[in-house]
UniProtKB/Swiss-Prot annotation:
GO BP field: translation
Subunit structure: Part of the 50S ribosomal subunit; part of the 5S rRNA/L5/L18/L25 subcomplex. Contacts the 5S rRNA and the P site tRNA. Forms a bridge to the 30S subunit in the 70S ribosome.
GO MF annotation terms: rRNA binding; structural constituent of ribosome; tRNA binding
Entry function: This is one of the proteins that bind and probably mediate the attachment of the 5S RNA into the large ribosomal subunit, where it forms part of the central protuberance. In the 70S ribosome it contacts protein S13 of the 30S subunit (bridge B1b), connecting the 2 subunits; this bridge is implicated in subunit movement. Contacts the P site tRNA; the 5S rRNA and some of its associated proteins might help stabilize positioning of ribosome-bound tRNAs.
Cysteine disulfide links: none
Native species: Chloroflexus aggregans (strain MD-66 / DSM 9485)
Pfam families on file: Ribosomal_L5, Ribosomal_L5_C
HAMAP family: Ribosomal_uL5_B
Coiled-coil regions listed in the entry: none
Protein name: Large ribosomal subunit protein uL5
PROSITE patterns: RIBOSOMAL_L5 (PS00358)
Gene transcribed to yield this protein: rplE
Keyword list, A-Z: Ribonucleoprotein, Ribosomal protein, RNA-binding, rRNA-binding, tRNA-binding
Transmembrane segments: none
Length: 180
């Protein structure tokens, strides 16, 4: 099974980036390293079933079983003790990463209400891009009738680009709908 976005990267994006940035070697061309999807589940302190629902949602969206993240410190004002489950996250690499990015750009983002494109200011200065989604139901993998609560999720796209300009060019050519 070949992933559509990976083929596009090697056939179209790599030659275009080599020409644009005048790279001498193909190994200098920025590439996707990993995508991290994180869901913070604050209500898990009172409701233990919320973590299970978040695990199922993230597994359906990404195709990979997420790991449960736990609190590092106790915070009395949040009624939180160290070691309590407070979120779920999954790190995608390889084919699953390209497949997820393809579905994010072509299916999920256009389904957001009043969507005009993602912001260019969400780069971190080192070539990585972060985006937050307010609801998980924009993914077609989630059945609206089976969710217990609308949760947001954060998506961090890590690239090998040394700066934001190269990362922007890479993501733009891969199909990320930026607001210009």
């Amino acid at each position: 099974m070949t992933v559509r976005l990976r083929e596009k990267y090697y056939k179209e994006v790599v030659p275009a980036l080599m020409e644009e940035f005048k790279f001498k070697s193909i190994m200098q061309v920025p590439r996707l390293v990993k995508i991290v999807v994180n869901v913070g589940v604050g209500e898990a302190v009172q409701n233990a079933k919320a973590i299970e629902a978040a695990v199922n949602d993230v597994a359906a969206i990404t195709g990979q079983k997420p790991v449960v993240t736990r609190a590092k410190k106790s915070v009395a004002s949040f009624k939180l003790r160290a070691g309590m489950p407070i979120g779920v996250m999954v790190t995608l690499r390889g084919d699953r990463m390209y497949d997820f990015l393809d579905r994010l750009c072509s299916l999920a983002l256009p389904r957001i209400r009043d969507f005009r494109g993602v912001s260019r200011s969400s780069f971190d200065g080192r070539g990585n891009y972060s985006i937050g989604l307010k609801e998980q139901i924009v993914f077609p993998d989630i059945d609206y009738d089976k969710i217990d609560k609308i949760r947001g999720l954060e998506v961090a796209i890590v690239t090998s680009a040394p700066n934001d300009e190269q990362a922007y060019s890479l993501l733009k050519r891969l199909g990320m709908p930026f607001r210009d």
